[in-house]
């Protein structure tokens, strides 16, 4: 029997983990970069990927001077590229099996 551990972070913990202010997190949420559960910032809970995504978003915003809309698009495209690379790798492995036959 396997058990699944679900990690959720509140606003304070996310701010500490990502080293950002609550105002910054609110902006990131407003632009759909991270999506918490809960209606208000006091009730928000974030998944375990939120600190990493938040750090990447802030880095793009600061270092490349992108607006938050641009950050959201860049992160979406980076995720799509990673997904396509994974799919390509899997397909290459499958193709390799057919070629060896």
From Swiss-Prot:
The lineage of its organism: Bacteria, Pseudomonadati, Pseudomonadota, Gammaproteobacteria, Pseudomonadales. Interacts with CbpA and inhibits both the DnaJ-like co-chaperone activity and the DNA binding activity of CbpA. Together with CbpA, modulates the activity of the DnaK chaperone system. Does not inhibit the co-chaperone activity of DnaJ. It holds the Pfam family MerR_2. Transmembrane segments: none annotated. Belongs to the CbpM family. This is Chaperone modulatory protein CbpM.
């Amino acid at each position: 029997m396997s058990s699944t551990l679900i990690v959720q972070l509140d606003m304070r913990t996310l701010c500490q983990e990502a080293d950002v202010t609550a105002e910054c997190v609110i902006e990131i949420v407003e632009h759909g970069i991270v999506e918490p559960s809960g209606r208000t910032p006091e009730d928000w809970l974030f998944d375990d990927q939120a600190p990493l995504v938040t750090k990447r978003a802030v880095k793009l915003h600061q270092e490349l001077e992108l607006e938050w809309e641009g950050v959201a698009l860049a992160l979406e495209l980076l995720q799509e590229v990673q997904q396509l690379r994974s799919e390509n790798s899997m397909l290459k492995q499958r193709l390799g099996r057919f070629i060896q036959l």
